[in-house]
């Protein structure tokens, strides 16, 4: 028997869950209850499992490894979170758009740290059926077979929930799995981590070279067959790239150094390439084109999209290589090209363009869209059995041009220019911005190719958009408050990091908890592990960090920390916030947009930069309507809303008022508060009601008939709402809830309070009775006087977001093809919504009628902007205005929310 083969039948999947996955999950969720360091406990669980596998199953770990590291498995299920949720609701025979389905679709809003969608799904199933106790257990090999079946049913396309529910394999697994098995089965289907970020620990425990080897082969099966004996170590030559196995490519590093410093870092001998907006792919050309693989950096095979041999697909037939080339690997970018407009389109259309061409070829008709995939090669890393990674970039480029013949609009070689100084960088960046490109990439001409590395041999330079500055800020984590979901204290730099300053190097600015996924929380924890200091025991030096009255439980040195890109709609300068944070103000509704891996503590936002835009984002202080607690401190704990429907109403132990005592509420939709421009979820509405003495019910009687003291709250005409209306129910707007809280009693309904339904004239009005006495009259007069003294607040139109574009500097581009009246209408709408109209040179956002402007005029405008920005910038990150289509302004006004400008770029 081969030493790599297993000598025992495949164990049950439940055994894998019990011995490894379940123990890791339990340990990660109960760290504080473990009497030893959690890392030690993790290692014990993993090593014990590996010993158990080797002694009872064998040395071939691949069947289990595919389930333990699902995101590195090459199977493609194309099952998205929403698809799984809807499929499970259909499996449970729940009505379409049910409350359960809607809650699951919004699971991230209620997810504590470490909680995944699979936990919510299993909880719903647990409420409706018993745990599986049958004798027919699914083995690991059987589960892999069922997953193969699900992958084949997807056939490279995104699987819909109907198809998933009808899948024989999917249904069999659900009917023959315990709740714990289901949890990890769902994680595997969604390709999320099942080992709590401990994959590298597991691989290293299996074999010391496993992690390094996986970075050059990206194939779990190859790894399992090659590294079955931990005592046999790999040679250095084994860790080089090989044909048909994906590897992690070299990446460019972003820097904010001056142009001169960048040129110096590249030893004044480098090339400049355009930065492409596409998907990084490597083409493996095998045996003269008999087989061609298109692999992503993580080993995902997209050959079915672009052509599995030289005669199939939209790209492979255009790979014209020298007749002596038997095998090679091309590193490059797959982009989307519009053949009609002769332009490169945004990244999101890459795969759909390939699928459109494939479907058109199969149907024997012309493509329905004008866009198609285009591969741009920029490196050659393998040729005829030899790795070229140790060769200088100049030689690799030379070989690339000799073996590959470009085919226009299908396969091209990226153009580059040699450079030696900062002036060349400026000129190239100016040209890239003029063309609407992402930026440029600089590469040291004599550098080697470093697999899986991001270093300064390759440097990318991208412009920063003015519109982002003031809404998007790169902030450094300087502290954290631990809880179910960690909140991070973020700070601003207030001094030059290269100088010794008396002031703190960083000061607290805001606390961020929203926007980070569980995986990002774990990634931050991995990067900062062992570097936190307890504030009460070891406070930071005031010359290092400065905090206000609000201090974190733990703090961290800036050089050990992580940078977050934080987005917010306003700046909060209330007196209470001035004391909490050392900066004297904070962000209102701030959330993390992404972790900035390309930045460090030296390149984050500074306090002086923040001061330049602070006044433009303080209008929230002027809007005081719908204040729930009238300035009083709210209860520190809110009612916890269940994640599933409950037949019993939920009650609060200690409400802050009795405004809604003896009243029951059924909340059927979210609420958008137009005065504060924020959305309040169903769960938060329920919490507010509970805090003021009300009860929450999730269902009415089976006929949905009106009931005494039952208030149905909603402002969306959903299917559930229509059913309740047909049963003669009255649907009340959520704004009535806040009106009652402000007044301190249940106010009578007015027409504006009714969303749908008719208010019966004969209804019992005793429920609105209040004891009107002298104190009440004085309160009423005081309220009226306040309104007279401050008439501005009454003049604000609550339904019109007057401050939507507040202090944004906008310009509408004039064009001879656009009527003057159309331009005036747009400018008037911008002014009505608080925008400031300025000249194009001073704008942070330029609004263009994209369908009515010529490409020549657009290029000319970009050229002027680029020239000005590059000349004025001292760092290699010029700030330029964003150019957006007119639909950006119209959609923002329509939705009462500033739309993401990157989705409306002019092409």
Curated annotation (Swiss-Prot):
Protein name as it appears in the record? DNA ligase 4
Protein location: Nucleus
**PROSITE patterns membership:** BRCT (PS50172), DNA_LIGASE_A3 (PS50160)
Q: What InterPro entries is this protein classified in?
A: Adenylation_DNA_ligase_IV (IPR044125), BRCT_dom (IPR001357), BRCT_dom_sf (IPR036420), DNA_ligase_ATP-dep (IPR000977), DNA_ligase_ATP-dep_cent (IPR012310), DNA_ligase_ATP-dep_N (IPR012308), DNA_ligase_N_sf (IPR036599), LIG4 (IPR029710)
Where do the catalytic residues lie? 275
Q: Which UniProt keywords apply?
A: ATP-binding, DNA damage, DNA recombination, DNA repair, Ligase, Magnesium, Metal-binding, Nucleotide-binding, Nucleus, Repeat
Q: Which Gene Ontology terms cover its molecular function?
A: ATP binding; DNA binding; DNA ligase (ATP) activity; metal ion binding
Q: Which domain of life is it from?
A: Eukaryota
Q: Which Pfam families match?
A: BRCT_2, DNA_ligase_A_M, DNA_ligase_A_N
Can you list the disulfide-bonded cysteine pairs? none
- The record lists the organism as Kluyveromyces lactis (strain ATCC 8585 / CBS 2359 / DSM 70799 / NBRC 1267 / NRRL Y-1140 / WM37)
